Amino acid sequence: MTAIGRAGSVAIVACLASMLLAASASADTKPPTLRRPRSGVQFTVGPVPVERGKEITECTYFKLPSKRDLDVNKVQIKVSGGTHHVHLYRPEDPNLDLADGHEACNFALDFSVWQLILASQNLELTWRLPPGVTFHFRGGEQLAAQTHFVDSGLLTTPTGEGWAVFNLFKMPKHRVKSYAGAIFGQDRDVVVPPGSSSATTRCTFPKPVKLLALTGHYHYRGVEFTAGTWDGTTGTEIYRQEGYDHPAFLRFAANDIPTVTGLQWTCSYVNTTTNTFTFGPFTDNNEHCNLFAFYYPTAGTHETITCVQQHGIVTTVVHQ
């Protein structure tokens, strides 16, 4: 073979390899497959670029892809990438109208502006609510999806892109008995010094609620998360998660739903470094001690509760 022939062959091989790598990357970064609901809506968030060794929390703004109101009794969320959390919010002001788009938003959304609807920390969540209990969505309403993808430490995003696909399954209006709401509990006082430590938050509600589900949330130093009922004096443990990976999303069976007047949660940490970690959004450099819970009945179609500990004071707010 001549020099030109050999060079041409090498060029062709390199070109083919490049094409194959591009095709492979394209295939890898498609959104995860999730069958669409027969009755309901599906929407996709992504791709969210994630640099090697970095993490990104991004907010994607869009409208519910349905002109009609939806009463949702079943939820599916499927994620690809190193997911730390995926949240879905609506604005407290029903007239808020943002242009579709996305931006970095490393901290939790402003609770005076946005209300949590759904939260997942797993690659796949399928959750059917008890009969007659639904999340209500207004047709075409403004929504925000907050996604936190990581490619460092205990989480990896091999393709360099994160995706989240949501399915909301519609229930006929005549079958709706109660509406569900979300509880966002957050300890902004959390401090994790070297060695072993823990942080506890206690929250009482203005009225008793029936718990549908709950999950705990911390960063890389977290080794155990417990949650329990709280009546202002004492309580009973109802949730325990050990380790960091795949925090359990505890669902209560329809015949075993607890009625609670409040919740308490404790995060236990082991910090093997000489650094002290404080509250903040980044998994490597900050810590969290958050609780996400879901309940019913609500006073209206869009009620949520926030419970925030800051400067030693716990503030509980019911948002309508």
Label the model's feature ranges.
Residues D28-K210, T215-Q320:
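Beta-strand-centric surfaces of beta-sandwich/beta-rich domains
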Residues V10-L20:
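Bacterial N-terminal signal peptides
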Residues M1-I12:
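Bacterial N-terminal signal peptides that target proteins for export
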Residues A23-S26:
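Sec/Tat signal peptide C-region and signal peptidase I cleavage site
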